[in-house]
Amino acid sequence: MTENWSIAHSSELYHIEGWGHPYFGINEAGNVTVSPRGDEKKLDLFELVENLKKRDINLPLLIRFSDILADRLARLHQCMDEAIARYNYPNIYRGVYPVKCNQHKQLVEALVDYGKPYHFGLEVGSKPELMIALATLDIDKTGETLLICNGYKDKEYLETALLAQQLGHNLIIVVEQIKELFITLEISEKLNLKPQIGVRAKLKTKGSGHWGNSTGEKAKFGLTIPEILTVYKTLKDKDLLHCLKLLHFHIGSQISSIAVIKDAIREAGQIYVQLCEMGAGMKYLDVGGGLAVDYDGSKTNFYASKNYNMQNYANDIVAGIKDCCDEANIHPPILVSESGRAIASHHSVLIFNVVNSNTPPYKLPEPVKEKEHLLIRNLWETYESIDEENYQEMYHDAVQFKDEVISLFNFGYLTLTQRARAEQIYWACGHRIYDIMKRQSYVSDDLEELADLMISTYYINLSVFQSAPDAWAIDQLFPVMPIHRLDEKPTEKAILADLTCDSDGKIDKFIDLLDVKKSLELHKLENSNNNQDNPHYKPYYLGMFLVGSYQEIMGNLHNLFGDINVVHLANEDDNYQLQYIVKGDNVANVLEYVEYKADELQERLRRLTESALMENKLTIEQSQLLLKNYDHNLRSYTYLQ
């Protein structure tokens, strides 16, 4: 522990109690801990990473804690069961996992296994996801486990789904477009099958935040009320109203305000009740996704948070639907939710190392000499004059003199050496002013530019585009923090820049209570470079948390940085074991994605080296070393070693 700094300070600084409870914390050694079951049994994350590296599992690395999945699933069902008991709701809850959140085999299979006691099912939104579900979801002889088919559907999709009903799956085809109904009925008649049909309603109620734009009357998916009535009339005319089983809606992926959920439940409840009164064979109400994750720990309706907990969510769904049904004397439906983000987000932690840093230049300038240029002397005078009374005025003077120096340099009146001298003094002014600023309770807006200039850049062994695409694409906030040295005071403020040759490959927005920070508090690196062969090398590890939903599957190959190493940890005999290791892409793998064959590339290079040998541009030893390195690189991880 450094003087005047403790792990309690780090806990408050990074808000880990807010977004991480009950799974993540900090131990006395200053390392992040993981409690996969949300109990007292804790793993030291830093020690875990070090042990994985000894197994030749290099960073960047994604660690999946299967027991967190199990715990999230159990908590969701516990909350729904408590709400059902509290409000005397005369029916049950049967959840489904939306496969689109994270389609990886180990995760889906784990959720199917953990979900068996709850009759927990799957939701699919495409033909490939349907193929996963049909082969993964066990047949539940009680018929309570749901397989819900959402998304746009063609004849192949619908025929496969209808035939799969005969295996024993409780499969419901949710109509998103009117034409899907007619194709479904045509196939059903041809195969002599009775379909189970649902309708997805476009509610007037809209979600908030980024995903709110995909809901409401202009939503991408779903049926308007007139279209739902068309479905009703079509089924009635064919004497198939008993096949209309489910009403589905979805008002967004991350609903931060409980008020929006209440409004949606009321609207959907009325639609459900009236369909029942009209004679439809309604049985299920699927409230979709939206159960939010508190990424910043503020517990507010900020877009990266939520102003409710899981029990509040369950209570409002159960109570709201019961009220609607009681008023109309309709038996309440089986409740269904597609809470993928809330189930999967916490179980994955992304670990990466810092490879270097770039801090604002500062070297104590030597006093100026009388013969130096007037602007350089003016900058020096400014530097010497800075104090707590005039620091704002001196900042403006320093900026003006620096701009004049650059102007004169551009017209050829100052030398490169003179410009360097002026910039050195300018940065010294900036550091002195910034030190004063940090001690003030209030800083004027015109000094914010200086604060931004004083932010360091930490270069990380990662591709944001591959491992955290939402941070780049939609400015999604994820908790990021060091996983060790948390008993030391962080002295640097930094943004994170990834390995890609793209200016968007950075993270420059970080969680804060009810706000977004432009920089992250980090520790000074203990190494000037990333030379891991140095016996005194000390790595600096950062973790990005709550990344278990969407990020892996949406990542892309920008600059051909491929999939990263993944490990699965699970509790076995009261000890946490490495359950699976999924090795990340090597260079040959990603080159094949873009249609290059490794053996062809090697042969081309061999020919080039032979030509170079003939022209005496290379020695035989050099050519063999080049070919050896080329072969080794093809088989190596796409990230820095």
Task: Give the ranges of each region predicted by the language model.
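Charged, compositionally biased N-terminal leader segments and the immediate start
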Residues: 1-32
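Charged (often Lys/Glu-rich) extended helix/loop segments that serve as interaction or gating elements
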Residues: 15, 316, 322-641
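Flexible, glycine/charged-enriched surface loops at secondary-structure junctions
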Residues: 59, 63, 85-90, 278-282, ...
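A non-catalytic, amphipathic alpha-helix used as a structural packing/dimerization or gating element
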Residues: 67-75, 230, 267, 316
